[in-house]
Amino acid sequence: MNDTTATRCGYVAIVGRPNVGKSTLLNHILGQKLAITSRKPQTTRHNMLGIKTEGTVQAIYVDTPGMHKNGEKALNRYMNKTASAALKDVDVVIFVVDRTRWTDEDQMVLERVQYVQGPVILAINKTDRIEDKSDLMPHLEWLQGQLPNASIVPISAQHGHNLEALESLIASHLPENDHFFPEDQITDRSSRFLAAELVREKIMRQLGAELPYQITVEIEEFKQQGRTLHIHALILVERDGQKKIIIGDKGDRIKRIGSDARRDMEVLFDSKVMLNLWVKVKGGWSDDERALRSLGYGDL
């Protein structure tokens, strides 16, 4: 991000279909892991702010759930509504797309981005994997035709390729404003929220094809005692079969989930962590609007 003489601050929405690299991009820009990632679609469920202050420029990134077509359940409707809402009242929109692949869900996002009045940046992800860059041209020309006023920046969210150019362009679009957050603040989310997300990430990474998407995590206790942070997390599933999958044979899987989550928590919170996990069946929670609100999913 380039330094400027003017003090600038604004909101930047990162949007795109599921699993296109939005959270990976945010983590790389921030220089640390904040948003959870996995190879599974719909990993991100909530909007989350990632705040980067560099010199006179403060960019407030809004990491959003991927917009998707399978929106029958209340949870899916919440995620789509949350992602769409992020396009309103922001100063810049980054639309992340794959270098070659275009899906119905990309089209769904495009149709919403076309109504955005402010600056739009098309971030073409994974371009570092293409040897002959001329292969990109037909796709880029088509995208430019769909969003004629958008800037196009080829990037690699995973490896950080060309992110300096992306951040410089973002900074140029931010309005002159005093900073909204302290210089050392990196997110608006609580430590309890981040802990729950880390547990959910490890579940998604451990389970692979067995993954039950009807899972969520609640933090029941988050308490610093001396040099140790004690965290009790409740994993909610919808069926007994899902509970058995998460626990695994003789509890081996839930032990791995806990061990992996604890390591990341100790880095994030800079503290020794004692993590306890429980699994509970709560049938139909992902399609129960009242249950979703009680679990922190907001208005539907």
From Swiss-Prot:
Q: Single GO cellular component annotation?
A: cytosol
The UniProt record lists the keyword Cell inner membrane = yes
Subcellular location as annotated: Cytoplasm; Cell inner membrane
Chain residue ranges for the region called G4: 125-128
Q: Where do the annotations place GTP binding? A: 16-23, 63-67, 125-128
Among InterPro entries, the record links this protein to: G_ERA_dom, GTP-bd, GTPase_Era-like, KH_dom-like_a/b, KH_dom_type_2, KH_sf_prok-type, P-loop_NTPase, Small_GTP-bd
Using the UniProt annotation, give all residue ranges assigned to the region (G1). 16-23
Per the record's keyword annotation, is Coiled coil included, yes or no? no
Question: Which top-rank group of organisms is this from?
Answer: Bacteria
Report a single Gene Ontology molecular function. Answer: small ribosomal subunit rRNA binding
According to its UniProt entry, the protein's GO biological process terms are:
ribosomal small subunit assembly
Q: Any idea which UniProt keywords this protein has? A: Cell inner membrane, Cell membrane, Cytoplasm, GTP-binding, Membrane, Nucleotide-binding, Ribosome biogenesis, RNA-binding, rRNA-binding
Membrane-topology annotation of the record: Peripheral membrane protein
* Coiled-coil residues: none
Q: Which residues form the KH type-2 domain?
A: 199-283
Spell out the residue ranges making up region: G3: 63-66
- The Era-type G domain is annotated at 8-176
HAMAP family assigned: GTPase_Era
The family assignment reads: Belongs to the TRAFAC class TrmE-Era-EngA-EngB-Septin-like GTPase superfamily. Era GTPase family.
- Whom does it interact with, and what assembly results? Monomer.
| Purpose | An essential GTPase that binds both GDP and GTP, with rapid nucleotide exchange. Plays a role in 16S rRNA processing and 30S ribosomal subunit biogenesis and possibly also in cell cycle regulation and energy metabolism.
- UniProt xrefs under PANTHER family: GTPASE ERA (PTHR42698), GTPASE ERA, MITOCHONDRIAL (PTHR42698:SF1)
Protein name per the record: GTPase Era
Cite the source lineage: Bacteria, Pseudomonadati, Pseudomonadota, Gammaproteobacteria, Pseudomonadales
Q: Which gene encodes it?
A: era
